[in-house]
Regions:
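Extended, well-ordered protein cores
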Residues: 1-85, 91-120, 135-210
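C-terminal structural cap/anchor segments
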Residues: 124-128
Length: 210
């Protein structure tokens, strides 16, 4: 990892991100979204991007919503030893996003901020086979991709609201996620579904997304 030329005690998260992506993209399953022969990992087509677009673009890659949740989680985690042990600082951390996963997203569903459309709810319930009574969808289903995208937007808005109440006390996005939305999502899920503590929407995944 190279430090910035202007300050040898500062690392650039954008450079670190490039390193992680170059290392990890090749290991993701090849049945995922592919552009120019390259599997993209945790990035999925989203029909909303196409229907809301004002451009008549035939390039389907334009309508892909990237998440890379596991890689971002890893990146957040790996910044900690550089800071705490080596006393180095990171720049461009604001380029990182929230983590679009089922605890953060489940919080907004359980609290009534987001809800499935009736047709999607019915389709999800028909796909459920575990007796949970919860709607289930594949990780690449448009419902899940849109839910995760909305999770990013809502956590960003929540982060700004929380910062306004911090009275100048520094709070990173990673701290909000770990001690705030993720923990709250788990606690609310435990209260609403004590037997399973599962998300209100079940994601059918092979473990390479969540």
């Amino acid at each position: 990892m190279k430090t910035t030329t202007s300050d040898p005690s500062t690392l650039d998260i954008l450079t670190f991100w490039d390193v992680l992506q170059n290392l990890l993209i090749p290991i993701w399953p090849q049945d995922r979204t592919v552009v120019n022969g390259q599997a993209l990992g945790d990035a999925w087509p989203l029909s909303t991007l196409k229907t809301q677009s004002k451009d008549d673009n035939s390039d389907e890659s334009t309508y892909i919503q990237p998440f890379h949740k596991l890689t971002q989680w890893l990146a957040y985690s790996l910044t900690v030893p550089f800071t705490r042990i080596l006393s180095l600082e990171w720049k461009n951390m604001s380029s990182m996003t929230a983590l679009p996963e089922y605890r953060n997203g489940g919080l907004f569903v359980d609290l009534g901020v987001l809800s499935l459309k009736p047709a999607s709810q019915d389709r999800g319930l028909k796909a459920t086979s575990d007796g949970s009574g919860l709607p289930s969808f594949a990780a690449g289903d448009d419902v899940i991709v849109e839910w995760r995208a909305m999770t990013l937007v809502l956590v960003d808005k929540l982060y700004k609201l929380v910062l306004q109440r911090m009275q100048g006390v520094e709070l990173s996005m990673a701290q909000l996620l770990e001690a705030g939305t993720w923990k709250a999502g788990r606690e609310v899920a435990k209260e609403k579904r004590p037997k399973t503590k599962s998300s209100p929407i079940v994601i059918l995944s092979d473990g390479t997304v969540f």
